[in-house]
Amino acid sequence: MRYFDSSRDTLTADHVMASAALPPAFPAVRIDGEPYWDGGIYSNTPIEAVLDDEPRRSSVIFSVQVWNPDGPEPQSVLDVLDKQKEIQYASRSSQIEQQRKLHRLRHVIRELSLHLPPEIAALPEVRDLSCWGCGTTMHVLSLVAPRIGDEDHTKDIDFSSIGISARWQAGYEEAQRMIASRPWESKVDVIEGVALHTLPPLVK
């Protein structure tokens, strides 16, 4: 998995095409001589790329899940194919939880270092250890796209104007709901560091 960052790399149309090159519908796109496919086939929510970025700073992170894995039990082979794709591209809650634990350890190190006597805190070896601490707060806003109409297992290659417009609108409305709730203003435990925010499902 390779992350391209506009702060370090010069991004071109090839990078955009590679980020949407889902096999087998699209071939890999070559960048610097290497073939790349959509990173979603490996990790659809690589939150570690944000939490490990240096210099680390408090952030509001929008984690977007395009396909909703919740729903009824599959009743046919086509339903199974649909569910398989939803699971494949779902955000990994275990991955987010792992990053939450790691960031909590950074906060614990920082809190412990604040309670050290000055003469101990000044020791070079202690300063080196204290540098692993961090006091940033990361608000992860989980956006899950609602199901749209009669979508099936081919929805990831549906580039019709109707399909694209429907997903744009659904995503816009979900983002508006999240922004209106302003969860990043909520207080976070000093030890935690990572707060995961979700929205209740819409009832229609």
Task: Show the residue positions of the predicted features.
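Patatin-like phospholipase
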Residues: 1-204
